[in-house]
Amino acid sequence: MTIPNDIRITPELVAAHGLKPDEYQRILDLIGREPTFTELGIFSAMWNEHCSYKSSKRWLRTLPTSGPQVIQGPGENAGVVDIGDGQCVVFKMESHNHPSYIEPYQGAATGVGGILRDVFTMGARPIAAMNALRFGAPDHPKTQHLVAGVVAGIGGYGNSFGVPTVGGEVNFDPRYNGNCLVNAFAAGLARTDGIFYSKAEGVGLPVVYLGAKTGRDGVGGATMASAEFDETIEEKRPTVQVGDPFTEKCLLEACLELMATGAVIAIQDMGAAGLTCSAVEMGAKGDLGIELDLDKVPVREERMSAYEMMLSESQERMLMVLRPEKEPEAEEIFRKWGLDFAIVGRTTDDLRFRILHGGEEVANLPIKELGDEAPEYDRPWAEPKMPPALDAATVPAADVADSLLKLLGSPDLSSRRWVWEQYDTLIQGNSLQIPGGDAGVVRVEDHPTKALAFSSDVTPRYCEADSFEGGKQAVAECWRNLTATGADPLAVTDNLNFGNPERPEIMGQFVRAIKGIGEACRALSFPIVSGNVSLYNETLGQAIPPTPTIAGVGLIPDWSKMARIAFAGEGQAILLAGAPESWGTHLGQSAYLRDVHGRAEGAPPPVDLAHEKRVGDFVRGVIRSGTVTAAHDCSDGGLAVALAEMAMASGIGARIDAPVNSASAAFFGEDQGRYVLTAALAREDAQLATLIEDARKAGVSLIAIGVTGGRELKLGEARAISVEELKEAHEGWFPRFMQDGSLQ
Amino acid sequence: MKSAVIQLPGLNRDRDMIAALTKISGQAPVTVWQTETELPEVDLIVIPGGFSYGDYLRCGAIAARMPVMKAVAEKAAKGVLVIGVCNGFQILLEAGLLPGALMRNASLKFVCREVKLQVANANTAFTRAYAPGQIIRCPVAHHDGNFFAAPETLARIEGEGQVAFRYAEGTNPNGSINDIAGIVNGAGNVLGLMPHPENLVEAAHGGTDGRALFESVLGRAA
C-alpha cells in the first residue's frame, strides 16, 4: 500500500504529528496555504523538540562555547578541538533514550551508530567511544532485560565497527524505571586542514545519496522521541531503527577515501528525520535551495511513499554535494565498498526545498524558514524545591569496614566489568587506559608522546537535590577525572536529559542545571563544543531525575608521565589533596547515606570552582613532574572507596591513619575537589615535607594520611580488609544480578 | 620479512596488524583487497580480525568464498606461512585450510579481556621464539571463539601436535574444547588463533608477550 499525498489535513492528523494548534497556524502563515501530507511530515520532523531544540535553545545560548582551542563549536555534526601538530579531536555525545527503552538492543546499537557517523561525517576517524547508561531499580521487572539488551547492542555495533569503548557510566535508580538513558559518545581524530562541513556551496551541483538503502524503519522516530511515554509504548516499536554496523564500517572507509580525493564539497549524515533534516541542513546553511527526486533514492522496500522516504530513519546513510568532475571517481569508491551511490537531486538558487516523486511535486517549502522559523519557547520555569541541609548529628555511626564493603558491592558502586568486557576496549592498538580508572586514555596515532583522555560524568542524585550545584558538579567531576590522569582538560560535550519541559518544575531543573554547567565551564575554561538535549523522559507523569551528562576530552602531552589509579608500589606515602583538615565533612546526598543508612537527604556537596581549579592545576603539575606515582579523584563513596579502588587495581594494600573527627564523614563524605595521590617517598622523608609546603604555597591542602603496603586495607581504627575481600565485594554484584536477578 | 595483509569489507583489526608487523619487521606489509586473484611474493600472509561481511550468515563464511581466498589457499599449498587471527581464524576454517569449527562463546556474550596462554607446541614456525610450555599474556576480543572439533579430528590435532596455544590457568574465555586457543594445519605453515598477539607488542600495550609470535616468523624469513 502506498500512502497518497492528498490525505486531508485534519486537526487530529496535525496533533498526531506532535504539532500544537498554534504551531500549525505558524505553518499556514509561513506558506500561505494548507500543507500537503508530505509537507506536514517534513514540518513535524523539523519542528519537533528533538530536532528544533525549541524549548532549550534560549538557554543553550548562554553556555560558553569558545576558546583558543575550539575550531568548531555547537551547530555542526560534532565539535572540533585543536590538539596541536595540525591535528584535532572531533567529538559529540547524543542520547538514544526513547528507542532504547522500546527496543534495547537496536535502540542502543543505532545510538552508537549515529554518534560514530556524526564524527566521521566531519572527516575524522573514530578512535574512542563511551556510553553513559541509567537504568531503573535493579528489582524492577524490566531492568535486567534493558541492561542486557543495551549493553549487547552497544557492543554489537561498536565492536563490529571497530572503535574501542574506553569509558562510561552505569547507574540504577527507580526514577528511571519508565525511561532508561543511553547517552553515546564518540571521538575521532582528523587533520585540522581536513575537516568537512555540512554547508552546501555552488548552484546546480549534484546532491548525492550514499550508503545503505532507505526502508520504512524509524519513520517518525524523532517525533516519537519528543513525547512522553504512556501505556501505548509497545505500539511505538516500528519507530526504532535497525542498525547494520557492517555497512557503517564500509561507509566510514568509503567516506574517508572519498574525502581524500577532494571530491566532497559538503556532507551531512542522515540521522534523526533522515533525508529531510540532512537536505534542509545542507541547503539552509549554504543559502541554497535543494531539489530532490525521490524516484532516484535507493530503496529496499517497494511502493514507498514520499512521506515515508522523507521521514525514514534508516541507518548508515549520507548526503553529499560533490564536485561534478569527480563523480566517476566517487562512484567507483562506493561501488568498491558495496554501497549505494545515487544522484538524487541538485542545489538551486531559489531557496526552496522541492520534492519530486512519481513525476509530481509533492512538497515545495521555503528552505531557510524550515529551520530558522521553527518555534522557539521561553517556557515558564519555577525554582525547584531544595531539601534542607543534612544535620550530620542525625547520622548514626556505622562500622567503617562493613560500610565500605557494602558500598563496594552496591548496584551503583560495584565493578562494571560485566559491562565493559562486552565492549572491545583494545581495538586499534592505542588504548592506554581502559574502563576501571578515572578516564579512558587513547594514544594519538602517529605521534610519539601525545594521548587523549575521555571521561563522562554526572551525579543525578545531586542534580535532583539541587540542579544548579549538580550541574556544576558534573562539569567539575569530569574536569577532575581528566586531570587525575595528568591531562589538560580541553572541552566538553553535554547530553542534557530531563523530563517534560512543559512542566515549570522540570523546566526549572533544566534552567538551573544549565546555569550551573555554564558557570563551571567558564571557571574551568572548559567550553562546550557539541551536545544534545533529550526532553520528555517521562512516563505517566513520572520524570527521570535531572541528568545532564558531561563528557570531556583532555590532552596528555606525554603519556609516559600519565597517572593511573593503581598503587604503584609498597611503602609509598598516601596524600590527600584539596581536602578540609578533617579529610571529609559532607554526607548530604552521599552514596553512604543512601546505601548504608537508606536516606536520600540533604544538599549535595557544593563545588568551589576556584578551589577546584587550584587543586587540579597543582595535581596535574605533580603528576607531570613525576613526583606522583598514582592518582585518583574522590567521588561516589568518598575517600574510602577511592582508596579501595586504588588497592584493588594494584593488589597492594594500605594503612591509613585514624581520622581526628568523625570517621564516617572523613571516609565517606563526598566533599568535592579532592584527589588521593601517592609518592615514592617515606612519610618522614624531607622531600615529602617540601611537597606539602609547595602545595600550601599554591593554596592547596595536602595531607599525608597513610602508607601503601601489604595485602590489606586498614582505615584508621576499622578492621583491616584484605584486598581479596574488597575485590570479591566489588566484582560480585553485577554478574550475580545479570545471572539470576540477585539483588545481593 | 615481506608480508601481506588481506583486506575484506568488515575486517577491522587490519590497522592493528599492519602497525604491529611494521614495528616488528621494520617493513610495512602490502595490503591485498578481497577481489585480487593473485598474491605478491611474500614470506607471510595475514588475515586479520574483525567482522568480515558483518559476520552475517556465519562468521567468516562469506569472506572464505571471496576470490583472494583461493589465492591464499594456493600460497598455503606451496608452503607460504599464513596466520589468521580471530575473524581470520574463522575465515581459514570456513575456507577449509584448518580443521574444526568456532562456535558462539559459551557465555553467549562478546568477551574482551586479557587471558593467559600456554605455548603448547614451541616447534612451529609461529612459536619457535617462545619456550616450550611458556605461559604468556594475551588479549582476546570475540563473540565466536569456542573451538570445537569432532572426536577423531580432535584426536588427530592433539596427536600431531597441531595445538599451538592453549588457554591457561583457568582463563579459557569461551568454552573451547581442550582449552584450544590456536592450531596449525598438518603441514605446519598455517596458524589460526583467536587471541590478538598484535595488541600486545609494545610498551604502550602494557606488555610485549605477543611479539615473539611475529619474531618466530621473522627468524625463519630472515
Curated annotation (Swiss-Prot), chain A:
Mg(2+) 1 binds at residues 94, 532. Gene3D superfamilies: PurM-like C-terminal domain, PurM-like, N-terminal domain. InterPro entries: PRibForGlyAmidine_synth_PurL, PurL_linker, PurM-like_C_dom, PurM-like_C_sf, PurM-like_N, PurM-like_N_sf. Pathway: Purine metabolism; IMP biosynthesis via de novo pathway; 5-amino-1-(5-phospho-D-ribosyl)imidazole from N(2)-formyl-N(1)-(5-phospho-D-ribosyl)glycinamide: step 1/2. One of its GO terms (cellular component) is cytoplasm. One of its GO terms (molecular function) is phosphoribosylformylglycinamidine synthase activity. The active site is at 50, 96 (proton acceptor). Pfam families: AIRS (PF00586), AIRS_C (PF02769), FGAR-AT_linker (PF18072). Keywords: ATP-binding, Cytoplasm, Ligase, Magnesium, Metal-binding, Nucleotide-binding, Purine biosynthesis. Part of the phosphoribosylformylglycinamidine synthase complex involved in the purines biosynthetic pathway. Catalyzes the ATP-dependent conversion of formylglycinamide ribonucleotide (FGAR) and glutamine to yield formylglycinamidine ribonucleotide (FGAM) and glutamate. The FGAM synthase complex is composed of three subunits. PurQ produces an ammonia molecule by converting glutamine to glutamate. PurL transfers the ammonia molecule to FGAR to form FGAM in an ATP-dependent manner. PANTHER family: PHOSPHORIBOSYLFORMYLGLYCINAMIDINE SYNTHASE SUBUNIT PURL (PTHR43555:SF1). This is Phosphoribosylformylglycinamidine synthase subunit PurL. The lineage of its organism: Bacteria, Pseudomonadati, Pseudomonadota, Alphaproteobacteria, Hyphomicrobiales.
Swiss-Prot record, chain B:
It catalyses: N(2)-formyl-N(1)-(5-phospho-beta-D-ribosyl)glycinamide + L-glutamine + ATP + H2O = 2-formamido-N(1)-(5-O-phospho-beta-D-ribosyl)acetamidine + L-glutamate + ADP + phosphate + H(+); L-glutamine + H2O = L-glutamate + NH4(+). Pathway: Purine metabolism; IMP biosynthesis via de novo pathway; 5-amino-1-(5-phospho-D-ribosyl)imidazole from N(2)-formyl-N(1)-(5-phospho-D-ribosyl)glycinamide: step 1/2. It holds the Pfam family GATase_5. Transmembrane segments: none annotated. GO terms for biological process: 'de novo' IMP biosynthetic process. The keyword Nucleotide-binding applies. Keywords: ATP-binding, Cytoplasm, Glutamine amidotransferase, Hydrolase, Ligase, Nucleotide-binding, Purine biosynthesis. One of its GO terms (molecular function) is glutaminase activity. It is found in: Cytoplasm. Its EC number is 6.3.5.3, 3.5.1.2. The active site is at 86 (nucleophile), 196, 198. GO terms for cellular component: cytoplasm. Residues 3-222 form the Glutamine amidotransferase type-1 domain. It comes from the Bacteria. Part of the FGAM synthase complex composed of 1 PurL, 1 PurQ and 2 PurS subunits. Part of the phosphoribosylformylglycinamidine synthase complex involved in the purines biosynthetic pathway. Catalyzes the ATP-dependent conversion of formylglycinamide ribonucleotide (FGAR) and glutamine to yield formylglycinamidine ribonucleotide (FGAM) and glutamate. The FGAM synthase complex is composed of three subunits. PurQ produces an ammonia molecule by converting glutamine to glutamate. PurL transfers the ammonia molecule to FGAR to form FGAM in an ATP-dependent manner. This is Phosphoribosylformylglycinamidine synthase subunit PurQ. It comes from Chelativorans sp. (strain BNC1).
